[in-house]
């Protein structure tokens, strides 16, 4: 009798879940409600077609659920045609660890202030959009961020110095915007990790902070700005820097006086006002890429290492640089 009742109960629950899928949903109902409101705010775009009220939101495209809590922990809308501003509703997904809007040319307006509510956020990527306005100071409140990418937008104004207060940041991308002003001095005083730093293709001016001498950047790209003066503070014999791009600025310093880390594999300093000679220590470095063209360098290119593996375009248009792969010195 007990076996029959147990079988009957199991069948009843099975048929109930078939007739009412909501009973078998893993998705948290509060999260589902917020997601459906986000879909509506974006005008029901095709990329969110799988977001239907009668299905489990843990199975929806562009979202993932935590395997233990079943709360939405990732919202990633990539290369789909969503239009308008980022809805404030994104701040009502309290368990988000990843938020991404990427390659959304019709996404406009400022960076949504409600994002500051997402204290558990680890990765924020708002890139290749038409977002405008400033880089907001409130981003420094997201202490769990390990990755911040605001590249390829229309952001303007100064870079907030408070971003150096993000203790877990592994990479900071602000490249390909319209940012102005100086690089914050505080970027030479990151309180935790030293992040890979990408500030290229902006309108930044002034000197590179001397505090950078204290930072050991693995990768740093400051190219295509209006930076002036001495960039030697980026380098150092005891650092572990691998990739440096300072090209197309107004930098002016003596290359032969710089101590370079043995870890350096890529150096691009083309189109500056850098003078001196190419250090003989370059023959000891395992360069995968090198470009020192369009500067004011003189003297013979040292022979050895990888230096002769690069063509003349890596060296030409200097004041009096000579030797292979350029013409012989006279």
Curated annotation (Swiss-Prot):
Keywords: Apoplast, Cell wall, Disulfide bond, Glycoprotein, Leucine-rich repeat, Repeat, Secreted, Signal. Mostly expressed in fruits, and, to a lower extent, in flowers and leaves. LRR repeats lie at residues 69-92, 93-118, 119-141, 142-166, 167-192, 194-215, 217-237, 239-261, 262-285, 287-309. PANTHER family: DNA DAMAGE-REPAIR/TOLERATION PROTEIN DRT100 (PTHR48060), L DOMAIN-LIKE PROTEIN (PTHR48060:SF21). Belongs to the polygalacturonase-inhibiting protein family. N-linked glycosylated. This is Polygalacturonase inhibitor. Inhibitor of fungal polygalacturonase. It is an important factor for plant resistance to phytopathogenic fungi. Residues 1-24 form the signal peptide. It comes from the Eukaryota. Homodimer. Disulfide bonds join 27-57, 58-65, 298-320, 322-329. Glycans are attached at residues 106, 130, 144, 154, 238, 254, 291. The keyword Disulfide bond applies. It holds the Pfam family LRRNT_2. The lineage of its organism: Eukaryota, Viridiplantae, Streptophyta, Embryophyta, Tracheophyta. It is found in: Secreted, Extracellular space, Apoplast; Secreted, Cell wall. One of its GO terms (cellular component) is apoplast.
């Amino acid at each position: 009798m007990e076996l029959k009742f147990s079988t009957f109960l199991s069948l009843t629950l099975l048929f109930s879940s078939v007739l009412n899928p909501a009973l078998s949903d893993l998705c948290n109902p509060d999260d589902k409600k917020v997601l459906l409101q986000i879909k509506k705010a974006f005008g029901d775009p095709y990329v969110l077609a799988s977001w239907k009220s009668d299905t489990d939101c843990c199975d929806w495209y562009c979202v993932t659920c935590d395997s233990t809590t079943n709360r939405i922990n990732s919202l990633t809308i990539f290369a789909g045609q969503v239009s308008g501003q980022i809805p404030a509703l994104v701040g009502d997904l309290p368990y988000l660890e990843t938020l991404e809007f990427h390659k959304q040319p019709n996404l406009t307006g400022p960076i949504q202030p409600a994002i500051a509510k997402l204290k558990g956020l680890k990765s924020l990527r708002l890139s290749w959009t038409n977002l405008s306005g400033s880089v907001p100071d409130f981003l420094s409140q997201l202490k769990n961020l390990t990755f911040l990418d605001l590249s390829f937008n229309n952001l303007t104004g100064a870079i907030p110095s408070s971003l150096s207060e993000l203790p877990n940041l592994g990479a900071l991308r602000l490249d390909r915007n319209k940012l102005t002003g100086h690089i914050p001095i505080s970027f030479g005083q990151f309180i935790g990790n030293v992040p890979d730093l990408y500030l290229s293709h902006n309108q930044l001016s002034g000197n590179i902070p001397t505090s950078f001498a204290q930072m050991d950047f693995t990768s740093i790209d400051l190219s295509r700005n209006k930076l002036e003066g001495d960039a030697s503070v980026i380098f150092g014999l005891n650092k572990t820097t691998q990739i440096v791009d300072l090209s197309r600025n107004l930098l002016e310093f003596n290359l032969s006086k710089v101590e370079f880390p043995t870890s350096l594999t890529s150096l691009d300093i083309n189109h500056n006002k850098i003078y001196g000679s190419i250090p003989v220590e370059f023959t000891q470095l395992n360069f995968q890429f090198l470009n020192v063209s369009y500067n004011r360098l003189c003297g013979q290119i040292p022979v050895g290492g990888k230096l002769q593996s690069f063509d003349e375009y890596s060296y030409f248009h200097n004041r009096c640089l000579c030797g292979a792969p350029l013409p012989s010195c006279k």
